[in-house]
């Protein structure tokens, strides 16, 4: 069960849901960029502690330049995403911000097809369309 991608994806979704709630509460009284920096520091320490307890330190030296570059770019994209997300949480309701943030799924599907040459089928198109529709329905606030 712990070797299943679905198990890990569901755990990720659960933790991401908690993240939105904790972040909304945490960003209430401070600058959103400072809140992001604090969160990032916690993530850095926490993930290094886990990685170093499970992976030999010597394996870090074996990482290729290409891998470092791609992970570095991923880190920059993550940082930019978090900065935007925390600002959105500071300005909006979690129940509206989180669905829009999850449009990242649609962007990832499209980019996977364009950059990674993954083949998309009708399920990707239908699912992506439903995600967009769902995000818009959840984020839309009718005029009072």
PLM features per residue range, with description:
Residues 34-41, 83, 89-109:
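Helix-helix packing/entry segments at the starts of transmembrane helices
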Residues 13, 17, 21, 48, ...:
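Hydrophobic/small/kink-forming positions within alpha-helical transmembrane segments
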Residues 26, 35, 88, 114-116:
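Hydrophobic/aromatic residues within transmembrane alpha-helices
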Residues 47, 123-140:
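Hydrophobic transmembrane alpha-helices of multi-pass small-molecule transport proteins
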């Amino acid at each position: 069960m712990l070797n299943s991608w679905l198990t890990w994806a569901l755990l990720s979704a659960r933790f991401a849901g908690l993240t939105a709630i904790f972040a909304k509460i945490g960003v209430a009284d401070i600058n959103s960029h400072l809140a992001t920096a604090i969160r990032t520091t916690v993530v850095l320490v926490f993930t290094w502690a886990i990685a170093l307890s499970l992976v030999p330190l010597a394996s870090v030296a074996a990482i290729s330049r290409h891998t470092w570059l791609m992970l570095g770019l991923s880190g920059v994209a993550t940082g930019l995403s978090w900065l935007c997300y925390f600002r959105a949480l500071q300005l909006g309701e979690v129940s509206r911000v989180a669905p829009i943030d999850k449009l990242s799924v649609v962007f990832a599907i499209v980019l996977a097809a364009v950059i990674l040459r993954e083949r998309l089928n009708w399920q990707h198109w239908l699912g992506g369309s439903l995600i967009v529709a769902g995000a818009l329905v959840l984020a839309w606030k009718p005029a009072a």
